[in-house]
């Protein structure tokens, strides 16, 4: 099977945007092969909907049906490129999100900012004697591990204690540095990601939830680069969250699987 794809680099979170139409039942297997065999070393794979660049609401489906903010940003940049450039913003549809995602494009600086789904809940779990906050989001949950060095062993224990979800992230946080480890159920993959958009949002939302009304800005240094988040609080609740940073797009490539 010959697969056409676009390599994308949203803040180091290497992503394959697959142009070849692949049925939902085959996506997990195709994605696993691409992550194992493509020379770019992809951390995740998204599948572009048919005639997406011409659609009123372009569609991207992630490999396990999960939500991904970085892939959303990269996909919006690709749609803009296919349309000839010049868009300042556009709406896209992506798996794991119940509503369209608005993306602001800053082509002059090579950046894109996605208006992210607001987390839907917070719970605490107990893991190895410590209390761990888990932020529930559409299509993915994130466990936040403050003052904790990255640890595969600890992540495994956290995953066992988390409720089932399409994707589960464990965010290891040291000051303003965040290291994401993400599990996707459909593909069975566990990846130390270079950056994680939804994890960035989860942490920013968690930090902002008790702050005064108004807009609060956060920036986290992740292995592949810096991601920014802006949380607008109104009447004690998060009303709007925007996440973004750099995006680089490559040219179309092919691989035989």
Question: What are the roles of these predicted feature ranges?
Answer:
Residues 1-111, 119-121, 131-136, 141-257:
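A glycine-rich beta-to-alpha transition motif near the start of alpha/beta enzyme domains, typified by
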Residues 123-126:
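Acyltransferase
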């Amino acid at each position: 099977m010959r697969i056409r794809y676009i390599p994308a680099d949203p803040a180091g979170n290497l992503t394959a945007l697959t142009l070849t139409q692949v049925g939902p039942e085959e996506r997990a297997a195709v994605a696993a092969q691409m992550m194992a065999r493509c020379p770019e070393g992809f951390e995740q794979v998204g599948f572009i909907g048919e005639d997406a660049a011409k659609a009123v609401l372009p569609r991207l489906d992630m490999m396990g049906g999960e939500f991904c903010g970085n892939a959303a940003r990269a996909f919006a940049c690709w749609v803009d490129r296919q349309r000839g450039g010049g868009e300042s913003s556009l709406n896209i549809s992506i798996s794991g999100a119940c509503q369209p995602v608005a993306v602001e494009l800053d082509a002059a600086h090579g950046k894109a900012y996605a208006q992210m789904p607001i987390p839907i809940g917070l719970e605490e779990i107990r893991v190895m004697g410590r209390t761990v906050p888990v932020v529930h989001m559409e299509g993915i949950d994130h466990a936040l591990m403050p003052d904790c060095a990255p640890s595969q062993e600890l992540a495994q224990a956290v995953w066992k204690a988390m409720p089932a979800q399409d994707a589960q992230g464990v965010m290891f946080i040291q000051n303003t540095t965040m290291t994401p480890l993400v599990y996707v159920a459909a593909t069975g993959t566990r990846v130390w990601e270079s950056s994680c958009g939804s994890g960035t949002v989860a942490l920013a939302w968690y930090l902002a939830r008790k702050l005064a009304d108004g807009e609060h800005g956060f920036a986290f240094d992740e292995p592949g680069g810096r991601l920014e988040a802006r949380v607008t609080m109104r009447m004690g609740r998060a009303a709007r969250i925007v996440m973004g940073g750099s995006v680089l797009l490559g040219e179309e490539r092919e691989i035989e699987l």
